[in-house]
């Protein structure tokens, strides 16, 4: 661990037990555990959410749910996070951790293509975290900005 990484770890709150369990299960049960956001990225996402105070969040790419749980922890009461995962084999793991979390009621898990699901959710999002299929990033951007002949899914300044 280099000096910067050590500094970050020394000045970051400890990982919550539920997230630690999810990290371990992800490493044991998935073929690509490196896709997990992890503790430091999760804390950073939570901080962004606390700073922005969004009412509606869209996450593209749930994986096993670590980043969704992290962001949900930063949401104000009454705010919601919609997370979209294309791989239906990950649904059970993610949903089981959402169900166990005190913030799980803020999370709505959708299985399928974000390009189909996100526009169908209606309304605009105040914050979007894209961590899905990297090849589809240009399509996600066009969808969010309304460049596909649809209404934009993000407001000005989002």
Language model: regions and residue ranges:
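S-adenosylmethionine/decaboxylated-SAM
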Residues: 39-158
């Amino acid at each position: 661990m280099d000096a910067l990484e050590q500094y970050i770890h020394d000045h970051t709150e400890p990982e919550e037990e539920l997230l630690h369990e999810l990290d371990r299960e992800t490493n044991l049960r998935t073929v690509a555990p490196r896709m997990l956001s992890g503790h430091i990225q999760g804390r950073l996402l939570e901080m962004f959410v606390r700073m922005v105070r969004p009412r509606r969040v869209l996450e593209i790419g749930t994986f096993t749910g670590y980043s969704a749980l992290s962001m949900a922890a930063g949401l104000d009461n009454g705010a919601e996070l919609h997370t979209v995962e294309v791989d239906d084999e990950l649904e059970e793991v993610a949903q089981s951790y959402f169900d166990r979390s005190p913030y799980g009621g803020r999370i709505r898990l959708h299985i399928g293509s974000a390009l189909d699901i996100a526009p169908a959710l209606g309304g605009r999002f105040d914050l979007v975290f894209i961590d899905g299929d990297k090849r589809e990033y240009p399509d996600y951007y066009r969808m969010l900005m309304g460049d596909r002949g649809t209404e934009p899914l993000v407001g000005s300044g989002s």
